[in-house]
Amino acid sequence: MTTKGYIGSYTKKEGKGIYLFELNEDSGQISSVNTGYEIEASTYLAQTDDYLYAITKEGEHCGVAAFKKEASGSLTLINKCLESVEGTGCYISVSSDHNFLFEAVYGAGIARIYQLNKDTGEIIKLIQELNHDYPLGSHERQEHSHVHYINETPDCKYVVATDLGTDRVVTYEFSNEGLKEYKVSKFKDQDGPRHIAFHNNGEYAYIVHELSNYVSVAKYKDGQFEELERHLTVPEDFNDDTKLAAVRLSHDQQTLYISNRGHDSIAVFTITENGAGLNPVEIVKSGDQFPRDFNITESDDYLVCAHQEGNYEITVFKRDTNTGKLTPTDNQQIAPEGVHVSFI
């Protein structure tokens, strides 16, 4: 069985843009990695059945690009929307009705919303750039707002964004007119919320904090997040610099995975109480440096991790579908400056 996927990359050093890879799920080996489309700063990708969207920039102009996906995984450019000079994004997602694309811009501390043509995949226009104006945290990296994630809530009623600079998670109402603040959830000073993964039941969320290296289990209801418990994602005695990165759930909703850049590891937790709790299982080395993103195959059999630094290795782990534990496979493929992983 062959599974195809994409890796998005920085293009500051050796990265080329969007890579296309093939994973042989019988052997656990990535058989090929090719440049799917050479494009600048494609650091995050979002997909629908027929289309792929990528963060990009040209000179000072920043925004997103739209592609048509072929069955082979090859990409054909539809158009680009580069209407902003306020900085390159770090996260994008598509609304469930495929009419909107949302973008988080870490450096400028803003959220963007674009209008899409769901039939052709075209990006029609940038609707809005929204600034955050909340009290800042006290960490040295919280000098201003830093929006790091934006996505639709499971009930499809709202859009939720994390703000690393203000220790807040903000939910918005959204429409053709743009985003409108609905509710704000505050976390601990110097947490630095980065990404969110929701349980499939829609009642619980796992919010990972880049600065404190904790994951919060939160009760989610009508745009509000209430923390129930929190867990450290690196060993307590690890004192070197490390920054938490990505968070993903296994498709069976039994295991949560979190990557740590610096400690260069993946923390594994069992999900308990129908989503309301976590039990630490293990912390395994990711196999290279700066594991900014990873993803899990639809079969739940493998976890594929990209690395932004070091030798740029794509590491493949075999999952124990009973315990969630990870066992590395012997894989030799690379994707320079890889920072996003998703499957077709």
Swiss-Prot record:
Membrane-crossing segments per the record: none
GO cellular component, one term: cytosol
Listed Gene3D superfamilies: YVTN repeat-like/Quinoprotein amine dehydrogenase (2.130.10.10)
Entry GO MF terms: 6-phosphogluconolactonase activity
A Pfam family assignment: Lactonase
InterPro entries the UniProt entry points to: Cycloisomerase_2 (IPR050282), Haem_d1_sf (IPR011048), Lactonase_7-beta_prop (IPR019405), WD40/YVTN_repeat-like_dom_sf (IPR015943)
Top-level taxonomic group: Bacteria
Family: Belongs to the cycloisomerase 2 family.
Protein name (database record): Uncharacterized protein SH1032
Organism: Staphylococcus haemolyticus (strain JCSC1435)
